[in-house]
């Protein structure tokens, strides 16, 4: 018996094809995705070229973490375009679009759960933070992304959507707190304060945009009910928070390898008592 003949079971291939077709038919939505595929591809080539002379050690680690950002992004955006990581969900009672089927780009949360830790890893290496702080912040970041996905995909009750949203924001506060306080102090001690401050401001300002877009978009209050407009908002944030951020960081590292290399050996260094 074919799986498509089993009652209640839907062919995943059919759903994927339908989702991909729906994305292609929405010019606003598809253009927001293709732009990022193109920019991510360009970023990969540029970053590989920039890293050709970067020496082993911390500079090379920063380069590796930074290169992963567009690599993850291009994979994710292709997943969205193919319909693999796009689905339809019915909004719960109390939502502005209650009872309506809304297209969810849940693959974005998968992207953020993989790419934002790389951003934080690169920043942590730049600031020469201790391993415990780096682990805590990256764990909080992943928690932020996972609970954000839960907020977007929960359909049982509107209260649960906003509860997950609040938890995600709480994780976000942990990340922001580290960037503004402890990590800034570490960067000052490491001699990388100037570039770290620039990247920190860029990261904090842009990352604050994501929960705002969620809140006003179709997933939240639905003040903006166009999935295409919401997708463009996320895509623009991604361009600056990922590719522009990464280019600024790599250009500085390539020109200041000695500073990065001698800034400290906190990460990966074992205690002399071991």
From Swiss-Prot:
Gene3D superfamilies to which the protein is assigned, alphabetical: Rhodopsin 7-helix transmembrane proteins (1.20.1070.10)
Cytoplasmic topology ranges: 52-57, 128-130, 181-192, 256-274
Positions contributing to chloride 1 binding: 105
Source superkingdom: Archaea
SMART domains: Bac_rhodopsin
Chief site of localization: membrane
Residue numbers covered by the propeptide annotation in the UniProt entry: 1-21
Cell compartments where the protein resides: Cell membrane
Purpose of the protein: Light-driven chloride pump.
Name of the protein this chain belongs to: Halorhodopsin
Organism (species): Halobacterium salinarum (strain ATCC 29341 / DSM 671 / R1)
Lineage: Archaea, Methanobacteriati, Methanobacteriota, Stenosarchaea group, Halobacteria
